[in-house]
């Protein structure tokens, strides 16, 4: 049970693969289908790959809860750490007085499975694998957020959406600051010199907590990150 008056210890959970809710619309979007549905043979291939992943992946997440605040229009402070979170995220989290700092991962099993596909030189499966991994990583975060929100609301508090370095004008290099809240190789995740995570389908980020915190729509219409696949303003169907 989360209690923000506690000593801010680390919470850790392994997620049964069956608890992950696969967002098919998001999957097809990442695969380039927009709002269309792939042909039946491709859907059958996706289903087969999900069965394979259920046998080899161990999704998990861990997080800490720390006090924090908005410092100015572009910076948040969590404990003693100052984040260059940018205007979009800072504004969205302006009411938060505590923050969840998290790491979530599909696990090393995905990387081993994905390497085998690459070695087999199956371009279709390789393409599907990358999209599946991304959706599974988001599903891990969704499970975590749902559980956190349920417990936080019992205390009369609310949570924000999740925000991660590399999105919404928050520099990717800021992941180093988030990882500093955890022991090395926490959840089996390493951060490379270029601030990429290993296993590859892993996510780090923050969630705001507070009595007046709201879940706001992601501000894709004002984000300057034109290469982001999430940026709906760049999608044409």
Task: Identify the residue ranges that each predicted region occupies.
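Active-site helix-to-loop segments that bind/position phosphate- or nucleotide-bearing substrates
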Residues: 2-126
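Intrinsically disordered or highly flexible coil/loop and linker segments, enriched in small
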Residues: 55-66, 141-142, 153-158, 229, ...
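Short secondary-structure transition/capping segments
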Residues: 106-107, 150, 204-208
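Internal, well-folded beta-alpha domain core
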Residues: 121-181
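Short terminal or interdomain "cap/linker" segment that borders an active site or interface and mediates
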Residues: 155-232
């Amino acid at each position: 049970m989360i209690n923000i008056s506690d000593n801010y210890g680390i919470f850790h959970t392994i997620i049964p693969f069956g608890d992950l809710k696969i967002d098919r619309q998001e999957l097809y979007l990442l695969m380039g289908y927009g709002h269309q549905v792939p042909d039946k043979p491709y859907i059958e291939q996706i289903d087969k790959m999900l069965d394979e992943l259920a046998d080899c992946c161990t999704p998990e997440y861990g997080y800490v809860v720390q006090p924090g605040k908005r410092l100015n229009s572009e910076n948040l402070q969590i404990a003693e750490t100052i984040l260059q979170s940018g205007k979009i995220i800072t504004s969205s989290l302006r009411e938060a007085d505590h923050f969840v700092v998290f790491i979530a991962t599909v696990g090393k099993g995905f990387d081993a499975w994905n390497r085998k596909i690459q070695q087999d030189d199956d371009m279709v499966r390789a393409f599907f694998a990358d999209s599946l991994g991304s959706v599974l990583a988001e599903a891990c975060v969704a499970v975590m957020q749902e559980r956190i929100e349920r417990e936080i609301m019992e205390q009369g508090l609310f949570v924000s959406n999740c925000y991660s370095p590399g999105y919404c004008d928050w520099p990717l290099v800021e992941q180093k600051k988030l990882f500093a809240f955890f022991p090395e190789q926490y959840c089996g995740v390493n951060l490379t010199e270029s601030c990429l995570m290993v296993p590859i389908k892993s996510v780090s980020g923050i969630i705001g907590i507070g009595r007046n915190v709201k879940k706001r729509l992601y501000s894709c219409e004002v984000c300057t990150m034109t290469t982001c696949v999430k940026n709906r303003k760049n999608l044409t169907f």
